[in-house]
Amino acid sequence: MRRDIPQDTVRRNEQVRAREVRVIGADGEQLGILSRNDAIAHAKELGLDLVEVAATADPPVCRVMDYGRFKYEQQKKKAEAKKNQTVIQIKEIKVRPKTDDHDYDTKVRHIRRFIEEGDRCKVTVFFRGREIVHKDRGQSILDRIVEDTKDIAKMDQEARAEGRTLFMMLAPLPKK
């Protein structure tokens, strides 16, 4: 009965399928093309594993190494790459066409904080009842927000109407 090997694992020792493999020694020197059994025997003599590093090459390339250490280093690299990823969130600020000056200033302060933290910001103007007739007021609020944040943000997406809302996206300016 043949066990299927998960995709993310590498073939080692008896799992290597090719009859002949190009072997790289433990200290990086080329040992040449050997039969699979000779390569495995050589690795076992050194107390190490024969690990397939390039399966698509002809013949496949195998390296003599400690498989446990190899897996550990792969996990460390993966963790380091994951740690260095930055997740950009989209924060949303909601305003109304009749938002007063103090409330407007508070909303702009929040937008500035989100942008400075590196997040994108969606600014939404909500219209209630008959306010929808005055879309120009909503557009003027969005234009004013763009003007007040132009030193740290750029408009990522133009103002767009959707149902009873008008929204736009702001993104941080690229760092110099």
UniProtKB/Swiss-Prot annotation:
KW Signal (keyword) present: no
Membrane-crossing residue ranges in chain numbering: none
Database matches in InterPro entries: T_IF-3_C_sf, T_IF-3_N_sf, Translation_initiation_fac3_CS, Translation_initiation_fac_3, Translation_initiation_fac_3_C, Translation_initiation_fac_3_N
MF GO annotations: ribosome binding; translation initiation factor activity
Alphabetized UniProt keyword annotations: Cytoplasm, Initiation factor, Protein biosynthesis
PANTHER family tied to this protein: TRANSLATION INITIATION FACTOR IF-3 (PTHR10938), TRANSLATION INITIATION FACTOR IF-3, MITOCHONDRIAL (PTHR10938:SF0)
HAMAP family reported for this sequence: IF_3
NCBIfam families: infC
Subunit note: Monomer.
Function: IF-3 binds to the 30S ribosomal subunit and shifts the equilibrium between 70S ribosomes and their 50S and 30S subunits in favor of the free subunits, thus enhancing the availability of 30S subunits on which protein synthesis initiation begins.
This protein's name: Translation initiation factor IF-3
Species this protein is from: Nitratidesulfovibrio vulgaris (strain DSM 19637 / Miyazaki F) (Desulfovibrio vulgaris)
